[in-house]
Every structure is written in structure tokens, then in C-alpha cells.
């Protein structure tokens, strides 16, 4: 059992945002069949958003992708249709200004155990770095409305440690690190971007080392509660993120690449590693920073 911001999780493995469609049937099937400690919803906004037109997703190399769905989602109202599901639900919320976050959060019911504020999407204008100028205001307003733990999802920017500090000082209960890294690919036949949006978020194994560095630096400065996300493809990757400060580890691209069965593989791999070392998972957290 792992306690994060007062919430108990069976083990460190959760599903990151953007993977599981926000429908009761799909979520319930994933919960029952694969037993993740929690599912993080797709980012939901107050009003529905249309996704960018195709192509929105392209494979860069083995275990590495570029995507720009553009936060397409049915809106926060879908939450009332989810009902009770048998694993914990973390709701990801997005917006282009403070009021949109407030409006969306005001619609949240008792289903989620935690709220994740996505202030770092690189794939829709006005929904990413522009939010950082008022991250404190977003956090303070959300915390004044909800009693659930609030985590802030940040991207791998150069000033990430400073921004993390601002979010925590404003009252965030923890951080989700990291979001995707903005990139671009060009078609050499017509010399236009391959993705319809132009740029996209780089995800997968190619950002794992970046995630390790960011989590390390933020944990070293503040020792906050962290959900670590970024290129986790096996139990070693998960242990690595835990060793630099993550309490929970989110799986994303690996589920696209290998399917949901990998959840069990990674969980069992962590268990075997800990048993062989004679360690508990809490003894590993942050050890790579403190040594």
C-alpha cells in the first residue's frame, strides 16, 4: 500500500492521461482485467473540444511517438456518466484561462480520488505554456473549490524547478512530471509538417532520460509528492523514476506499444526486484537524489 496525498494506492503503477477513453464501459473493463492502481482520465475541459484533424499521431522510432490530438474531449459533463468504477480515478482538467479551470472543476463529483491540472499541453494554442503566467491563481482557485488532492502536470521546461515551486507554494498537493516535449517532423516530399497541427508532443522512451532529470531536480529542491511519467517501458524504468522521487509511476506510450498486459509485467517486475533486494518501495523513493 502506498499513500499519496492522503489517498491509498495498492501499488505505484497508474495509467497516465490520454490513454483510456472516458467511457464507463472501457474504464471498467481496464480496471477489472488489468487492475491498475488508478486510471488518469483524458484531459477534460468545461466545454467539448474537437480534436485536430488527421494525421495526429506518428511513430518516430521504436517506442517513440509524436502526437497532437489537441485535447479533443467530450467535456467535463461526461464525468456524470461514468458512475462508480472499480479502480481509483484521477481526473485531468484543462483550460485556456483561470475561469475555464474553475468552471470545469466546479462540475467534479465524488468519483475521482484526485485532480490533475494539465497546465502544460503543447498541442493546443492557449492551453500550454501560456497558463504558466497564472499557475498560482489556477491552483489557489481550484483548491478553494475542491477537497480532493490537486496535482499540477508540468512540462520539461528549462525553468521547471521554479514553476514547480510556484505551484506548490500556491497549495498544490503534488506534481505530475513530465508532460510531452514539443517537436516537429517534416515530410521531405512536400516539405510540410507531417502532423496537421504542425508540432506535436514527443512521448515514449526517447523522453525517459529527460523525465528522470526533471523529477530528480524537482525532488531535490522540494521533495514533493510526484507522479512520474515519461518513457516507462519496463520495471527498471519504473524503479528509476521512483529512485529520483516519484511515488506513483504513470504508464502511457508503452500501453500503445505493448498493450495493457504490460501493467502486470511491470508490477510483477517491481515486486521481484524488491524481494530480491530485501527492500520496500518506500525505501527506494528518492535514494538516487539523496546519495
Curated annotation (Swiss-Prot):
Compartment list: Cytoplasm
Record has NADP as a keyword: no
Pathway participation: Pyrimidine metabolism; UMP biosynthesis via de novo pathway; orotate from (S)-dihydroorotate (NAD(+) route): step 1/1
CDD domains referenced in this protein's UniProt entry, alphabetically: DHOD_1B_like
Binding, FMN: 17, 42-43, 118, 153, 178, 204, 230-231, 252-253
Binding residues for substrate: 42, 67-71, 118, 179-180
Catalytic activity: (S)-dihydroorotate + NAD(+) = orotate + NADH + H(+)
Cofactor(s) needed: FMN
Any Pfam family hit: DHO_dh
InterPro entries attached to this UniProt entry: Aldolase_TIM (IPR013785), DHO_dehydrogenase (IPR050074), DHOD_1B (IPR033888), DHODH_Type1 (IPR053488), Dihydroorotate_DH_1 (IPR024920), Dihydroorotate_DH_1_2 (IPR012135), Dihydroorotate_DH_cat (IPR005720), Dihydroorotate_DH_CS (IPR001295)
Domain of life according to the entry: Archaea
Alphabetized UniProt keyword annotations: Cytoplasm, Flavoprotein, FMN, NAD, Oxidoreductase, Pyrimidine biosynthesis
Cofactor binding mode and count: Binds 1 FMN per subunit.
UniProt-annotated catalytic positions: 121 (nucleophile)
BP terms from Gene Ontology: 'de novo' pyrimidine nucleobase biosynthetic process; 'de novo' UMP biosynthetic process
An MF annotation (GO) of this entry: dihydroorotate dehydrogenase (NAD+) activity
EC number from the UniProt entry: 1.3.1.14
Subunit details: Heterotetramer of 2 PyrK and 2 PyrD type B subunits.
Similarity annotation: Belongs to the dihydroorotate dehydrogenase family. Type 1 subfamily.
Record HAMAP family: DHO_dh_type1
Job description of the protein: Catalyzes the conversion of dihydroorotate to orotate with NAD(+) as electron acceptor.
UniProt-recorded name of the protein: Dihydroorotate dehydrogenase B (NAD(+)), catalytic subunit
